[in-house]
Amino acid sequence: MSTAVTILTDTWTRREKRFDGHAKILAIGTAIPANWVDQTTYPDFYFRITNSEHLLEYKEKFRRICNKSKIRKRHLVITEELLKKNPNLCTYNDASLNTRQDILVSEVPKLGKEAAMKAIKEWGRPISEITHLVFCTSSGVDMPGADFQLAKLLGLSSSVNRLMMYQQGCNAGAVMLRLAKDLAENNKGGRVLVVCSEVMLSVFRGPSLQQEDNLLAQCLFGDGSAAVIVGTEPRPGLETPLFELVSAAQTTIPDTDSYLKLQLREMGLTFHCSKAVPSLITQNIEDCLVKAFEPFGISDWNSIFWILHPGGNAILDGVEEKLGLEPEKLRASRDVLSQYGNLTSACVLFKP
């Protein structure tokens, strides 16, 4: 497992002379599908649409998982009509990768476009000034990729520099900020459009008595996209910086590659999450923070603004308790989880 830490600020300075060329976030945009599900009634819908209502005890177990998730609702591309047209999506083991791909290759960039357009509108500059596009998704794989499709949808210049990142999982939101920081700071005058777009159709399937991890995936993930525009030296009166990207770091915890896995199979993207993941994060979070913040002389974890990926309520509770955080420190992360579920890469860029 990898932990990515990105330090954003509009007030902090280093001990040494401040570097004026730090990248800034100039705009943020988000988007969600219009269709949404109520978490309290979702177990009834899920077991009915997957023809699994005979699994009464398993359904009640799923209901308990949903009730404990602290998720109120999730927005989904999935509708009853879509699932009835594609029944192979509703069983656990049916070969359905082609069906999923056919839907995702259009839905992922389309949802990404909505977030990107909102970010561009907030930025207030011509779209022709975008020099780089970085796109990320764990929903589907295609070539030409979702970055190419999004560039066409937006009408970006044919000379825009594109980078496509597939299958980076929940870690990707912070990683994308790190990449955007590097691109902006090494390309004077560049403006980097970052887009994360996720559609949980890739992991949707019926229940399996042998794979309880699947129930967690069906309870947890939602659909959404987020976009930010990053650049250096904002032009006074023309651009308004929201955050400064001061530093970015990534730490991989040794011998943890089996704890959290998503694997692309004929049946789609399968999900495995060890029950030890929340405690693993809790045990290692402070060491990661010390390495990231020590150069800035910061050791009081309540003195900083938090954007923690809401991978699940147990993770948020564990980090809060381990670090002695005041309740409001993780309020934004809890609000995103409650209103949208786990949006994978888009979560840390989302506004509750």
From Swiss-Prot:
<dbReference type="InterPro" id="IPR012328">
    <property type="entry name" value="Chalcone/stilbene_synt_C"/>
</dbReference>
<dbReference type="Pfam" id="PF02797">
    <property type="entry name" value="Chal_sti_synt_C"/>
</dbReference>
<keyword id="KW-0284">Flavonoid biosynthesis</keyword>
<dbReference type="InterPro" id="IPR001099">
    <property type="entry name" value="Chalcone/stilbene_synt_N"/>
</dbReference>
<comment type="similarity">
    <text>Belongs to the thiolase-like superfamily. Chalcone/stilbene synthases family.</text>
</comment>
<comment type="function">
    <text>The primary product of this enzyme is 4,2',4',6'-tetrahydroxychalcone (also termed naringenin-chalcone or chalcone) which can under specific conditions spontaneously isomerize into naringenin.</text>
</comment>
<dbReference type="GO" id="GO:0009813">
    <property type="term" value="P:flavonoid biosynthetic process"/>
</dbReference>
<feature type="active site">
    <location>
        <position position="170"/>
    </location>
</feature>
<dbReference type="InterPro" id="IPR011141">
    <property type="entry name" value="Polyketide_synthase_type-III"/>
</dbReference>
<dbReference type="Pfam" id="PF00195">
    <property type="entry name" value="Chal_sti_synt_N"/>
</dbReference>
<dbReference type="InterPro" id="IPR018088">
    <property type="entry name" value="Chalcone/stilbene_synthase_AS"/>
</dbReference>
<keyword id="KW-0012">Acyltransferase</keyword>
<protein>
    <recommendedName>
        <fullName>Chalcone synthase C</fullName>
        <ecNumber>2.3.1.74</ecNumber>
    </recommendedName>
</protein>
<keyword id="KW-0808">Transferase</keyword>
<dbReference type="GO" id="GO:0016210">
    <property type="term" value="F:naringenin-chalcone synthase activity"/>
</dbReference>
<dbReference type="InterPro" id="IPR016039">
    <property type="entry name" value="Thiolase-like"/>
</dbReference>
<dbReference type="GO" id="GO:0030639">
    <property type="term" value="P:polyketide biosynthetic process"/>
</dbReference>
<comment type="pathway">
    <text>Secondary metabolite biosynthesis; flavonoid biosynthesis.</text>
</comment>
